[in-house]
Curated annotation (Swiss-Prot):
Record's keyword annotation contains Cytoplasm: yes
Location of the LRRCT domain: 205-243
Name of the protein described by the UniProt record: Protein phosphatase 1 regulatory subunit 42
PROSITE patterns: LRR
GO MF annotation, one: actin binding
Native source organism of the sequence: Danio rerio
LRR repeat intervals: 30-51, 52-73, 74-95, 96-117, 118-139, 148-169, 170-191
GO CC terms of this entry: centrosome; cytoplasm; manchette; microtubule cytoskeleton; microtubule organizing center
Taxonomy of the source species: Eukaryota, Metazoa, Chordata, Craniata, Vertebrata
Keyword Signal recorded: no
Record function comment: May regulate phosphatase activity of protein phosphatase 1 (PP1) complexes.
């Protein structure tokens, strides 16, 4: 097992020969950048002497657990992509961390980020997920990042919705290509809350094939500069925004007119019910509705008496059930 230790740093590090007056311990205390990428490292040992470390490169290794970083209170950049990490943990003391790279691991839930009050970039693309599973997001972690996170990469994670990310209102860049996003209305709702969004990559998602997909997102994301790798022309954006505003303005009066007509009909029906069918105003309105127009032929009125058959087969006139029928000819 290859472990990252101070001895390995001494062996492979760049302790300058010209600094012979400086001890190795002093060198470690002053160290700010440490690059041990692609060294087959499986575990991080105690590096607490490197108290001023700000950038740590550990990508392309065999690390299975994030550990022993509690000393690195000054760390701002952590690169641990392409390892065997399955859980985001032990990062609570990294209060200055602004960029975290964890792509290409085996993480199933984005969690354990509640104490990262300075995190601006999070990269968790291309996780090695079990068949049929998608990357999930812990609400507490997402809520804690709502005022700081600007750049998020969640591409290639079988994600089919973005509701959980709605609180991230400081977002400027979202990379979510090669997922299973399909609901254009959901995306419009989420992105309408991200007023600072400048770059959006949803390429190779099912939603890209929806009618007017590009037009709808450009309209709702009013400051978007780049969509799916294509620049957005300012004139085109303004045209789409104006077109939507005009369409909405025309729709409102029609909706209002329909609503007024519906209310009037309801009031008329209600009034007739309370007045009763024999009220003069009701009879007048009823007769006006049945009156033929000038272009119609006058009706011929027939009186028919309901014939009631007696037990002998003969008909008797029922005066009490006299009906009137009108026939147009």
């Amino acid at each position: 097992m290859v472990r990252l230790t101070v001895h390995l740093i001494a062996k492979l590090g760049s302790h300058s020969k010209s600094s012979r007056s400086e001890s190795f311990q002093q060198y470690l205390r002053k160290l700010t950048h440490l690059n041990f990428s692609d060294k087959n490292i499986e575990e991080i040992d105690d590096l607490s002497v490197c108290r001023n470390l700000t950038v740590l490169y550990l990508y392309d290794n065999q690390i299975s657990q994030i550990c022993n970083l509690g000393f690195a209170s000054n760390l701002t950049h952590l690169y641990m992509q392409n390892n065997n990490i399955s859980c985001i943990e032990n990062l609570s003391s990294l209060h200055k961390l602004s960029k975290l790279f964890l792509g290409g691991n085996s993480i199933t839930v984005v969690e354990g980020l509640e104490e990262l009050k300075s995190l601006k970039e999070l990269h968790v693309e291309g996780q090695k997920l079990p068949c049929g599973e998608k990357l999930a997001f812990d609400p507490h972690s997402i809520s804690s990042l709502s005022e700081t996170l600007c750049i998020l990469n969640i591409s290639k994670n079988n994600i089919d919705e973005l509701w959980d990310l709605a609180p991230l209102r400081k977002m400027t860049h979202l990379f979510a290509a090669d997922n299973q996003l399909h609901d254009i209305q959901e995306l419009e709702t989420v992105f309408s809350q991200w007023f600072k969004l400048r770059l959006l990559d949803l390429s190779r998602n099912p939603v890209c094939h929806k009618p007017k997909y590009r037009d709808r997102l450009i309209t709702v994301c009013k400051f978007l500069d780049d969509l799916d790798g294509k620049q957005i022309n300012e004139l085109s954006r303004q045209f789409l925004i104006n077109w939507k505003a005009s369409k909405d303005a025309k729709k409102k009066p029609e909706d209002g007119k329909d609503n007024k007509l519906q209310v009037a009909n309801q009031l008329s029906t209600s009034a007739d019910f309370h007045l009763g069918p024999q009220h003069p105003s009701v009879r007048e309105r009823s007769s006006s509705l049945s009156k033929p127009s000038e272009n119609e032929k006058p009706g011929v009125t027939f009186r028919t008496d309901q014939i009631q058959a007696d037990s002998r087969g003969r008909g008797t006139r029922g005066d009490s059930s006299t009906e009137w029928q009108s026939l147009k000819i």
